[in-house]
Amino acid sequence: MIAEAAQTEVGAAERARFVRGQMPSAGLFAGHDWRVSPNPFRLGPELAADLDSLGRVLLQFYRAVNLLYRKSIEGKQPEWVARCLDLGKPSELLALQRSPAFKNDLPRVIRPDLLITENGLSVTELDSVPGGIGLTAWLNQTYSNLPRAERASVQHPASPASTNGSVAVIGGADGMLRGFESIFGAASTIHIVISEEAAAYRPEMAWVAGQIGGDKFKIQAPEFSDFRDGEAVYRFFELFDLANVPDSKKIFELAASGKIRLTPPPKPVFEEKMLFALLWNRNLHEFWRQELGEKFFNRMFRLVPYTWLVDPSPLPPHAAIPELNLTDWQQLKTLSQKERELILKVSGFSPHAWGARGVYLGSDLSHADWSAAVDNAIANFQHSPNVLQRYHKPGLVDAEWFDFTHNEIIPMKGRVRLCPYYFVSGEAEQARAHLGGVLATICPANKKIIHGMTEAIFAPCSA
């Protein structure tokens, strides 16, 4: 038994060194490191199948969101929907969002943030301009090339016991690369325009461009403007950051005229976390049921935690905020720490709306800090709305990472976030979302909010 354990550890060390040895010389994230797992994170067949089918559901949700916004503008759905989604946006951006040229355009990369809780999956938000495409592509490629006889998998408690032999990562070695390439159709040249705000992701996108090969993909600074007819642009910058992308106006004009292909489209509605609050709003249930279909409608409600838009508009004295039984958002400050299993976060169109910025877990804050966050959310409603979301604590998983300093495998109890990447190819109703790969971020058990950090393990997922 001792000899077998030692042999297993030697094999794990070998795999971890192999992974580290494949790191591109330019790195993947500027100034960011993570813990290396010797194995993929194993989901089990049932969860893997759930993720494979989830892309269809989320694409249909985006279609429904797009339609809801348009119908709200036309007066065929409640006017307050568009009014809330438009809060804080400049008129030029709203004009683009409402332009006939972009009428049916949807993001072609869909990445949900999923937590594995004791009650199943929880989708906390959707990202239409996600980082991690290159990282996940590199992880898939690297772990697919581990020595076949040694492959194993880290797994969460619901997974079957891992066996020796081949464990294929979800999406395969090149699923992320082929998926990303597919979203640009027949474009001969694709310009990936990266803002300074997103500059940390430049190395991973440069790696993607190099792997796809040739001169098809080009990494461009925000000042780049030499676009040719028939080319495509991948917008790797958030819409709040347009002031720092000097030629964003030209990009949008060329896309509107049909001279270039642009994704994601210049539609801030898809960068708003309040979409989940609209999903939960009972006034809109019939719309969602009709546009999603009963099966997808029910699945979204199983996955999405209850979400509220923190709108300080006065309620009638006999009315209350659903589920919370509060008659005024100021009363949110009076909840006990135990009652504050709630996440408060900026909805969108803000430098604080991505990553772990602008995210407050009520049960993890003092009364004073929680009160300050609530006051800020109420005060900023007109130009930077916030949402409140029920917090479902991720369950514990067993993981391990390799300590290169001490040359040993370190077991770790952790909590995991799954980020599947869906790539949408095809046009209009023929468009389909394909799963390219799944990134697991495993943070130590004492971390309440899961995000990329030096103490986190990044690993691709296998079934």
Please place each PLM-identified region on the residue numbering.
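Preference for protein termini
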Residues: M1-A463
